[in-house]
Amino acid sequence: MPLSDFHVSEPFTLGIELEMQVVNPPGYDLSQDSSMLIDAVKNEITAGEVKHDITESMLELATDVCRDINQAAGQFSAMQKVVLQAAADHHLEICGGGTHPFQKWQRQEVCDNERYQRTLENFGYPIQQATVFGQHVHVGCASGDDAIYLLHGLSRFVPHFIALSAASPYMQGTDTRFASSRPNIFSAFPDNGPMPWVSNWQQFEALFRCLSYTTMIDSIKDLHWDIRPSPHFGTVEVRVMDTPLTLSHAVNMAGLIQATAHWLLTERPFKHQEKDYLLYKFNRFQACRYGLEGVITDPYTGDRRPLTEDTLRLLEKIAPSAHKIAASSAIEALHRQVVSGLNEAQLMRDFVADGGSLIGLVKKHCEIWAGD
């Protein structure tokens, strides 16, 4: 399928997607019932969309195009209420978190969807292993060239986005020792990590043509890059965050990305170069492994900086932009999180260290999501 033209969007408009876990009490393993829930709510959702993701244990909540995080929060709140009621009616529960702590990937059923079934045929078992749960944030752009500039700018802060949202320390019943283990699942895919270097939209079109020759790439949706342009929507989509445990934290993460995008496109603080990506995977690893306790390295100077320190610096830089787009509350909340040193991955480990079971952990996550 040829690449569509870049659809012109109103700059800095927002779209958010949350991949939620559908679980089956009292054992709190993943259920295979997302299709049933989607059918139950389809006539009750007035804004946004509730839809499938790769496997039947995943439920995606997606906003419409929103002008700011307050509008997005309102849409999510309404969807959350409808979905929670439908889940209760079917004796199911819903929670966040980047991974389910003890599910077995072999049990996961790929949705009866042509694209997902084709992807399963192409990639095999990694598709079932990709039963992990992330938050994606779209930011509107006025042109394809703006989208490429924004993508490169946001890529500098991928470690910060991962560290702030880290919520997947457990996988397959084991403490992975990672704050965010979810991104590791995608390492088997040939397009894992950053987008190959291009400097403008024309070069991106040539890149996509080259990728399509493999016959494995039919559309942008078949690419698993950390950040990707979405020409059909006229956006740049950031895909590196774990799904948070609370709706409020998800909204704050979206506000962070929207404010960072506003700062990048209005100030143009960087002249992007291919060398910017030289240590990308090393810095990304630090964030996944250690969260905000990680250390990032400048590819030009070799200077090493604590992620905590660099994240506080980013929040300070984007504060004026956040004020202009009504996202100051998000930046202030994230600032408090960084200063406190708390993150969701550590809270999960603390629960288990205090004697909680992994079953109890999922139960607690369901209570947190329903109570937010």
Swiss-Prot record:
Reactions mediated catalytically: L-cysteine + L-glutamate + ATP = gamma-L-glutamyl-L-cysteine + ADP + phosphate + H(+)
Record function comment: ATP-dependent carboxylate-amine ligase which exhibits weak glutamate--cysteine ligase activity.
Catalytic activity, EC: 6.3.2.2
Domain of life: Bacteria
Subunit-level organization: Homodimer.
GO biological process: modified amino acid biosynthetic process
Keywords: ATP-binding, Ligase, Nucleotide-binding
Record-stated family: Belongs to the glutamate--cysteine ligase type 2 family. YbdK subfamily.
SUPFAM superfamilies: Glutamine synthetase/guanido kinase (SSF55931)
Enzyme class: ligase
A Pfam family: GCS2
UniProt protein name: Putative glutamate--cysteine ligase 2
NCBIfam families on file: gshA_cyan_rel, PRK13516.1
One annotated GO molecular function: ATP binding
Gene (name only): ybdK
Record flagged with keyword Nucleotide-binding: yes
Gene3D superfamilies, per the entry: 3.30.590.20
